[in-house]
Amino acid sequence: MEISFTRVALLAAALFFVGCDQKPQPAKTHATEVTVLEGKTMGTFWRASIPGIDAKRSAELKEKIQTQLDADDQLLSTYKKDSALMRFNDSQSLSPWPVSEAMADIVTTSLRIGAKTDGAMDITVGPLVNLWGFGPEQQPVQIPSQEQIDAMKAKTGLQHLTVINQSHQQYLQKDLPDLYVDLSTVGEGYAADHLARLMEQEGISRYLVSVGGALNSRGMNGEGLPWRVAIQKPTDKENAVQAVVDINGHGISTSGSYRNYYELDGKRLSHVIDPQTGRPIEHNLVSVTVIAPTALEADAWDTGLMVLGPEKAKAVSYTHLRAHETVLDL
């Protein structure tokens, strides 16, 4: 199903976004106190803003959130050798490999959006990510050779991965023994959506939850207004706001090349790898922000658009996202 109400921000200036719990002007109604819970997961931070819950409920909820996120990390991590994902990666078997419904859904969404971005969003790019030192392995001491890059590219490709649904059981199947799936590009989005489902299960209908750069929300904030997200430029000394958007009931995610990088042989190397070249991206698009029905979808789309660069990303967003607004800040 196409996304008919997505807003895409394609920015050639560095961006980040934070949840806004307050209206930019005084509220006309009595405000409800917003409790903010925070913690760590997946090498990043999580946050939940919830109006109108007491201290006892907050403590109980924080424990449930952390437990769930720890389980998500155990499902998706490439840093934990005993994670569900790494057990699949380490297996040389070409037979269907049983996985959870959650894993199958994440991979299905990733493959779908990967196809719509002409392979730019590629969850099999892990060998290249590791080669360039952005995975569990250490950074290289020199720029990888073309031979090394080609060898790793031969182990990648969305066409080598299939999701199978049979008799209430889901499977992943690869046709390359060394295929390595890396879900770090969509893990935060999935976890944010999972937190939103936890809020619903707990009877909470007003919340803003985030994991890393992915957010999901529902209902009104403490001022009785829709949740709003400020998109800012971290390179701006004044932290000027690029845009403020309402995300009520939607997911939002950002991908950027400005935070996770290192310099080697005089070159600045981004963690965003282009599956076509096998190298870090070199274009001038620094960040992409996407609003979509779910944070998982937004997380997948922003990665693909980030890889494509400003011109191709703009074309793809209009073709597949039917975007309401595209912003280029050059």
Question: Where are the predicted features?
Answer:
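Intrinsically disordered, low-complexity repeat segments enriched in small/polar residues
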Residues: 6-9, 329
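Bacterial N-terminal signal peptides
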Residues: 9-16
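Single conserved hydrophobic/aromatic residue that forms the stacking wall/gate
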Residues: 320, 327-330
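Mature catalytic core of soluble alpha/beta enzymes
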Residues: 2-5, 17-322
